[in-house]
Curated annotation (Swiss-Prot):
The lineage of its organism: Archaea, Methanobacteriati, Methanobacteriota, Methanomada group, Methanococci. Heterotetramer of two alpha and two beta chains. InterPro entries: Arg_biosynth_ArgJ, ArgJ-like_dom_sf, ArgJ_beta_C. The gene is argJ. Pathway: Amino-acid biosynthesis; L-arginine biosynthesis; L-ornithine and N-acetyl-L-glutamate from L-glutamate and N(2)-acetyl-L-ornithine (cyclic): step 1/1. This is Glutamate N-acetyltransferase. Its EC number is 2.3.1.35. It catalyses: N(2)-acetyl-L-ornithine + L-glutamate = N-acetyl-L-glutamate + L-ornithine. It comes from Methanocaldococcus jannaschii (strain ATCC 43067 / DSM 2661 / JAL-1 / JCM 10045 / NBRC 100440) (Methanococcus jannaschii). Keywords: Acyltransferase, Amino-acid biosynthesis, Arginine biosynthesis, Autocatalytic cleavage, Cytoplasm, Transferase. It comes from the Archaea.
Amino acid sequence: MRVIDGGVTAPKGFKANGYKEGKFGVAIIISEKDAVGAGTFTTNKVVAHPVVLSRELIKNRDKFRAIVANSGNANCFTKDGMEDAKEMQRLVAELFNINEDEVLVASTGVIGRKMDMNIIKDRINKVYNLIKEGNSSINAAKAIMTTDTKPKEIAVEFEVNGKTVRVGGIAKGAGMIAPNMLHATMLCFITTDIEIDKESLTNILQKVVDKTFNNISVDGDTSTNDTVFVLANGLSGVNYEECGEEFENALLYVCRELAKMIVKDGEGATKFMEVVVKGAKTEEDAVKASKAIVNSLLVKTAVFGGDPNWGRIVAAVGYSGADFNPEVVDVILSNYKDEVYLVKDGIPLADEGTEELKKAEEIMKSDEIKIVVDLKMGEFENVCYGCDLSYEYVRINAEYTT
């Protein structure tokens, strides 16, 4: 497997482009033939209208031709939101001469504001004309940005019996990131030219989302609009049964890299952190403990301040609900070059005036840090990704709708 250019347009038979002016943008991804579709969505009880619409579409049909997404308005908690989401479907279907039910819809932006459909129609028409002229995955990625500071895209390919399979993706997200998608707003659209059935694609996607997007945190909020779509059009000529493990690894890589990009672009973020909890008695314990650490506001602010306050880490594990014996735990801090034990076998090492504390303080100056907690209770492990919480985060969100 190798990384290539092209994002969602790298796989055969996919076109994409986007247009944004001011706060309002639209991206469209289109497949030249029917593509098997799968998706996962927010578990927030307040659900945006495009999520309701697309969730039903995914539930009731197997194949799709297009994805349309707008930025600047979440189309959530509004009187005419469902009609507006369906109008987006209709506009795209009419331009590309496909059925309305073949169009999946997503939105991101401010909650509770009515969509200005004149703006949406203008943007959709502009993107249609751009797609006729050429492909631009990066333009599509830029069009769905809200508080993001940079577009997020990636693509990979691998060989199977002389044929090439490609997987590409774009994503957006910088705030309201603590996805929990069983079936900033976090949007991710993935394309692939592998041939695969809906059941297999759905199962693989859920497994991958659990390992990636459901393990990231910027601010601990779960959006009303979180969505991941995958379209697979089969144009590589390679069936999933020929390369199951390779395809899963490719999809996992794409989603993990996009998840990391989202975290690194977290609103006001200055530092990236990887949290590994290992030695847990159960998988559930590993997940609980790692998420408690990565979501802890006290841990996030300590990371921002460069403070190796390991007490906040063990406190988070303690309230996580995971089975945990403080008398045996290890806590290790690293910057991927140097590492230091903050706690070993339940004994604090990074105490006032120690070499361990000095080393920890140097490590905390790095832009990327890794926290490893070994519970020594079993064999299970989970990895989460997060970022610090800065003054800038407060400013961005205090001024979001103004």
